[in-house]
């Protein structure tokens, strides 16, 4: 569910929020496929208009006293003509296509048992990339991956969740946010539509009834 939770990044990831890479006060949206199984969420860095919540440091992931020793990490070029600088596309059930600034990647996971999953990351470039562009893609690969400046927090929080659920194997809980609809929203990413779309697909192929 991590990659389908389109609003968690701005709340959890200090790097995204502090250095204004991907935030909810940028233009963006989320588009679901017709069957709702697949989705893409996106944001446009150039449209940032800092919201009061961020300026007043009410978002805990905003650490504005932080700075980079190598700020050139964020000196991205515009790779496409749609202004999109961050996107996550999921292909049901376990394939993800990712764009973060100029870092292009494919990731997928392989279950290794009931309590173990292996996650693979494949970083991409173009044959037409200049040496400078190739160097930038390699540098920005440090944002994600197993020990990425952004992704390391995902590994941490997922471990917390796994430990918590192991402690109560016979219990269940559910928190409903924003209704039950799974539909596209091209004005906001503060939605659980993609998560619902995934479970809609899961129910369908497993033969479960809603």
Roles of regions detected by a PLM:
Residues 1-210:
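C-terminal catalytic domain of Rieske-type non-heme iron oxygenases
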